[in-house]
Amino acid sequence: MSFVVIIPARYASTRLPGKPLVDINGKPMIVHVLERARESGADRIIVATDHEDVARAVEAAGGEVCMTRADHQSGTERLAEVVEKCAFSDDTVIVNVQGDEPMIPATIIRQVADNLAQRQVGMATLAVPIHNAEEAFNPNAVKVVLDAEGYALYFSRATIPWERDRFAKGLETVGDNFLRHLGIYGYRAGFIRRYVTWQPSPLEHIEMLEQLRVLWYGEKIHVAVAHEVPGTGVDTPEDLERVRAEMR
């Protein structure tokens, strides 16, 4: 099955300036992500960046770069620019791999592509079970609830679904009803073209979750349980130190 990986790599970061180029055991982080994408069997891998230094690092590692504008409001908008510049056909399967996930398993990159290809839907993603209360109540862990066919009903930073009877007795434990959304997406290129024509939705602004725009406009997102749990992503200096230790 043919698919393309696009890795958005925005240079500016409030908490970690120059994030794509931070060193992880002798390599820039973006090169680690590129290597994981290569292991997935993708037909083509493109790093989408707004900074020449990132482009040089990727090209030095033998990767392909697409220079994009610096003013995109979301990663999906950056993807849309690449889709147009590369003139991908509407049925091309695109997997969006975050540029700050150096420990992402190649298997789940492939999984989200396969998941999309097997369904008549424009967008697919992955989730993993939540087994502890700390994560269930953490607003940085985005929860998702599904219908009987595995399509997303809603994504939220809130604790959904709310286990009324269990939580009436205390908030120390959770049942087996929670899923944490992973920030990896598969799209058909034509869907990306449509997505960027839609105005941002109120729910998207409230939760700060751009995937809610898709549900707002009545489209479906299929969600599969990931075959592997990805390692730590890099958002802060503390995350960076953890990843360096785990990847030694």
From Swiss-Prot:
GO terms for cellular component: cytosol. It is an enzyme of class 2 (transferase). It catalyses: 3-deoxy-alpha-D-manno-oct-2-ulosonate + CTP = CMP-3-deoxy-beta-D-manno-octulosonate + diphosphate. InterPro entries: Cytidylyl_trans, KdsB, Nucleotide-diphossugar_trans. Pathway: Nucleotide-sugar biosynthesis; CMP-3-deoxy-D-manno-octulosonate biosynthesis; CMP-3-deoxy-D-manno-octulosonate from 3-deoxy-D-manno-octulosonate and CTP: step 1/1; Bacterial outer membrane biogenesis; lipopolysaccharide biosynthesis. Its EC number is 2.7.7.38. SUPFAM superfamilies: Nucleotide-diphospho-sugar transferases (SSF53448). Its main location: cytoplasm. GO terms for molecular function: 3-deoxy-manno-octulosonate cytidylyltransferase activity. The keyword Transferase applies. Keywords: Cytoplasm, Lipopolysaccharide biosynthesis, Nucleotidyltransferase, Transferase. GO terms for biological process: CMP-keto-3-deoxy-D-manno-octulosonic acid biosynthetic process; lipopolysaccharide biosynthetic process. The keyword Nucleotidyltransferase applies. Disulfide bonds: none annotated. CDD domains: CMP-KDO-Synthetase (cd02517). It is found in: Cytoplasm. Activates KDO (a required 8-carbon sugar) for incorporation into bacterial lipopolysaccharide in Gram-negative bacteria. HAMAP family: KdsB (MF_00057). Belongs to the KdsB family. PANTHER family: 3-DEOXY-MANNO-OCTULOSONATE CYTIDYLYLTRANSFERASE, 3-DEOXY-MANNO-OCTULOSONATE CYTIDYLYLTRANSFERASE, MITOCHONDRIAL. This is 3-deoxy-manno-octulosonate cytidylyltransferase. It comes from Shigella dysenteriae serotype 1 (strain Sd197). The lineage of its organism: Bacteria, Pseudomonadati, Pseudomonadota, Gammaproteobacteria, Enterobacterales.
